[in-house]
Each structure stands twice: as C-alpha cells, then as structure tokens.
C-alpha cells in the first residue's frame, strides 16, 4: 500500500465569521506552498513574498512580468538546447556565487561564467545590484506559483 503524504496549510487568524472565506483562501495558498516546499505544515503568514504575489488581483500582470524577464532566455534555451533559465535561477539563488552555481549544476566554473556572460547580454542587464536582480527573483517566484496562483 503506498504511503500517503499529508500537507496542511493554515490560514490567517479569523475573529469574525465574515472573514472566514479570506482565511480559507489563504490556507489554500499555504497548502500549495507546503507542497512546493515539501513541508508538512505551513502557515500563510510564513509564505513571505508569495503572500504579496497572491494578493495581486490582476494575475495577468504577474504572467506579463514573468514573460518580460524570462521569455528571451526561454527562447534561447529552446533554440540552442541550452539551460540559461536554470543557470540564472541558480545564480540568483546563490547570490551571484559562480562556485556555488557550478557545484549545484555539476558544471565547471568557467562554463558558468560563460553562460552568465551570455545571459547578461541576452537580458541587457548586468545583474550587479539588488534592483537589477529583483525582477528576475520575482519572475522565478511567479513561475513557482503557476498552476495555483491563477485558480
């Protein structure tokens, strides 16, 4: 018999029954985050940036931001069978550490340097400052949310 895994999402505290539906929807967000983050229990209040993105009413703007940031790299990956999107994600996750990206991707650091150089050219962005990197961080958060943010 297969083992079942249970994930629990906890909504926000609700003192008024009229706010129950808000708490329920927040619990749904939390359970999706529990699944994504492979946690058994997660509270909506612990979902960080995902809380803010979930609250954006016009979900189309989230799709647009993701596309603006990642479409050129996705097209390059499709055309040349590269993995620049994955490389950028690792680069951002490791705060620009070439060695950490190389270790995670089982790739030589010179290969990572070459890819990052090309990524910067494709994006027209040096990715040096937090302000330059932020839209791409958010785009990856949005991507992680797809499949449930648009429900």
Regions found by a protein language model. Give the residues of each.
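Cytosolic nucleotide-utilizing catalytic cores of signal-transduction proteins
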Residues: 1-151
């Amino acid at each position: 018999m297969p083992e079942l895994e249970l994930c629990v999402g906890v909504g926000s505290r609700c003192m008024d029954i009229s706010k129950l539906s808000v708490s329920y929807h927040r619990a749904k967000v939390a359970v999706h985050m529990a699944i994504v983050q492979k946690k058994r229990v997660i509270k909506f209040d612990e979902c960080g940036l995902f809380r803010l993105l979930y609250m954006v009413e016009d979900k189309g703007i989230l799709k647009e931001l993701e596309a603006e940031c990642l479409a050129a790299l996705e097209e390059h990956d499709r055309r040349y069978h590269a993995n620049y999107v994955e490389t950028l994600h690792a680069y951002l996750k490791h705060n620009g550490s070439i060695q950490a990206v190389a270790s995670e991707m089982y790739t030589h650091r010179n290969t990572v340097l070459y890819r990052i150089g090309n990524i910067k050219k494709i994006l027209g962005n040096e990715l040096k400052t937090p302000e330059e990197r932020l839209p791409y961080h958010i785009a990856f958060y949005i991507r992680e949310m797809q499949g449930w943010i648009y429900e």
